Amino acid sequence: XNPPQDWLPMNGLYYKIFDELKAWKDAEMFCRKYKPGWHLASF
């Protein structure tokens, strides 16, 4: 499957870097609302 536009595929998952500053809790909620089942990644 092709990744969504502007998303990076890695090990069967997709990642996107956002440049808007958010608190961790708010960023996690943003990810969950963006698509159910998705979560904020940490590196």
From Swiss-Prot:
GO cellular component annotations of the record: extracellular region
Residues annotated as domain C-type lectin: 10-43
Localisation: Secreted
Top EC class for this record: hydrolase
Stated family: Belongs to the true venom lectin family.
Subunit structure: Monomer.
Protein name per UniProt: Jararafibrase-3
Lineage of origin: Eukaryota, Metazoa, Chordata, Craniata, Vertebrata
